[in-house]
């Protein structure tokens, strides 16, 4: 039979919770209340917590053994409060006047500002009277004692201000002559220096560095051939050529000299010193005459930069020497006396007179009267132009 349908609003009833099934108690079960309490993390005390509690208990027992009334706070409260009250009374007695920290300075600053204001008002009144002229000369003038006192205070304040201004003016850095002398010297040096000369000097230093780098020893490298090495072709998986057909190339050595049995150590080249670089720069050996001189000349030009004046002189001297006849060389070699090694090792005799002459030459005055006068004239010209400010 079909269920009856109600016409209208059908409200669905909520599902009631099912009642838990009643468990039948066991015959051998215990009905203690402690069995139903769930075991939580708070009930389970760890070993570390127990250890801390035991240590605290031991400390309490020691303290009670020394003083039985140590934890009797209610009994000792009156004594503690009495000690606090005594300290407060001592502080009050020490500060009878109850002087404040900042009030005195604030009052002084306020009085100073008032005096400054009175001084400004007085100046303004004087300017107004000057404008009025003789308009109110026939009127009586009344001056009270308070106004006179105020005028005296304003006068003292003005004197104090003048003293402070004079002291600050004397101790200011701008008025110190030593500072001005130092500043004037640096200013003169900066003006005397020509900026173009400084730039030129920097360029010369750069050129010298480049020349030193270019004149360093260049290792003879093999000529680069235009032919590129044949690229290795990847072996195809379909090729029938065996690996044995292609003989492996021996490894190429990466150092100079012949291979020897054992460990072939490569000797590191020592870094050239500054003196050696100068020697290399000044020394240019004459190449032997050969057919390929024309081919080597452009390479040498590329490697070496513009020759220095010292190197040019050395080249000219060598060329002039090479032009001379071999007979002259033989004559010179015959005339030159041979010096033995003992004579070379003997200490040289010092000529005191020659040494004194050299010292006098070094220490003699180089500025003539004309140079000093010219420098003096230049200084006066700069002074007239306003470049040099004389120290006052």
From Swiss-Prot:
Q: Where in the cell is it found?
A: Cytoplasm; Nucleus
Give me the gene this protein comes from: ccdc-55
Q: Would you tell me the protein name for this molecule? A: Nuclear speckle splicing regulatory protein 1 homolog
**Keyword tRNA processing in annotation:** no
GO biological process entries: inductive cell migration; nematode larval development; regulation of alternative mRNA splicing, via spliceosome
Coiled coil recorded as keyword: yes
Traits of the deletion mutant? Early larval arrest, continued gonad expansion and shortened lifespan. RNAi-mediated knockdown results in continuous distal tip cell migration past the midline during adulthood. In a rnf-5(tm794) mutant background, increased severity of the distal tip cell migration defects.
Please report which protein family the annotation says this sequence is part of.
Answer: Belongs to the NSRP1 family.
- Which residues does the annotated region (Disordered) include? 1-73, 113-169, 187-357
Print the keywords alphabetically: Coiled coil, Cytoplasm, Nucleus
Coiled-coil ranges from the UniProt annotation:
76-132
Instruction: Briefly state the protein's biological role.
Output: Required for the cessation of distal tip cell migration at the end of larval morphogenesis.
């Amino acid at each position: 039979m079909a269920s009856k349908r109600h016409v209208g609003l059908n409200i669905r009833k909520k599902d009631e919770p099912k009642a838990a099934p009643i468990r039948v108690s066991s015959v051998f079960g215990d009905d203690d209340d402690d069995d139903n309490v769930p075991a939580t993390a708070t009930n389970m005390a760890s070993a570390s917590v127990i250890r801390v509690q035991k240590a605290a208990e031991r400390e309490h027992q020691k303290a009670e053994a020394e003083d039985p009334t140590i934890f009797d706070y209610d009994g000792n409260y009156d004594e503690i409060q009495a000690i606090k009250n005594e300290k407060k009374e001592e502080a009050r007695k020490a500060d009878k006047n109850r002087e404040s920290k900042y009030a005195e300075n604030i009052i002084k600053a306020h009085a100073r500002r008032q005096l400054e204001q009175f001084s400004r008002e007085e100046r303004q009144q004087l300017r107004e009277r000057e404008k009025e002229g003789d308009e109110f000369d026939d009127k009586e003038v009344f001056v009270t004692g308070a106004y006179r006192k105020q005028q005296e205070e304003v006068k003292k304040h003005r004197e104090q201000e003048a003293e402070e201004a004079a002291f600050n003016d004397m101790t200011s850095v701008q008025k110190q002559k030593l500072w001005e002398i130092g500043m004037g010297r640096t200013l003169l040096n900066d003006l005397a220096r020509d900026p173009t000369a400084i730039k030129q000097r920097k360029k010369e230093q750069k050129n010298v560095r480049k020349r030193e780098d270019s004149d360093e020893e260049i290792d003879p490298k093999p000529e680069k051939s235009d032919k590129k090495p044949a690229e290795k072709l990847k072996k195809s998986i379909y090729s029938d050529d065996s690996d044995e057909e292609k003989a492996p190339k021996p490894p190429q050595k990466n150092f100079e000299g012949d291979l020897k049995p054992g460990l072939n150590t490569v000797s590191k080249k020592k870094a050239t010193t500054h003196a050696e670089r100068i020697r290399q720069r000044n020394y240019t050996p004459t190449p032997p005459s050969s057919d390929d001189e024309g081919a080597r000349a452009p390479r040498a030009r590329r490697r070496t930069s513009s020759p220095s004046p010292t190197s040019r002189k050395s080249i000219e001297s060598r060329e002039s020497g090479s032009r001379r006849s071999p007979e002259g060389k033989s004559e010179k070699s015959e005339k030159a006396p041979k010096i033995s090694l003992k004579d070379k090792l003997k200490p040289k005799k010092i000529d005191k007179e020659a040494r004194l002459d050299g010292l006098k030459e070094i220490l003699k005055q180089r500025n003539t009267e004309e140079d000093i006068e010219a420098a003096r004239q230049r200084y006066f010209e700069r002074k007239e132009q306003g470049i040099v400010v004389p120290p006052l």
